[in-house]
Amino acid sequence: YSAMAAALCSLKGPRHGGANLMVMQMMQNIRENLHDTEDDEELEAYLKKLLHGEAFDRKGLIYGMGHAVYSLSDPREVVFKGYVEQLAHEKGRDKDLALYNKIEHMAPQLIAEERKIFKGVSPNVDFYSGFVYDMLGIPMELYTPLFAVARIAGWSAHRIEELLSANKIIRPAYKSLGGTHEYIRRNERE
């Protein structure tokens, strides 16, 4: 139980667990600062301001874009988006969906140009999950707990696996080919 509690407590902040909150806050900021969310030129200019750290939280990020592993597309987002579109139509949120779609199409190109990232950037599952929670009437304070609840089954499975393996030490199934390097003190690093 302590490990589960620690895992839940580690889900604080926008990096892991709070990213959909940041997307929602960013989208609200975009709506508040654009005269017309359907104006592509105005939206593109604002997205550039985000990337230059001149708008919203000044971090230089378009939240919900990019993933550490998935570059061409996040398979979770690809599947999820169909449900997002269906729910948006049912809830009468087509205008909001249109804004998300515009950002989904504009952001990767702008990020590639501004950041010189050419490996590919695509929306991740957090880009739409907060929008879905909002359409379902779920308060923002519950977004991160929902993120955690979805993982508890996996965490529990890992724990059961550990109990069944008689506490054997798990070792990586690969050998590093990187070689060794002399340690350089932190204050001496470039």
Residue map of PLM features:
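Non-transmembrane, aqueous-exposed alpha-helical and coiled segments at domain scale
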Residues: 1-190
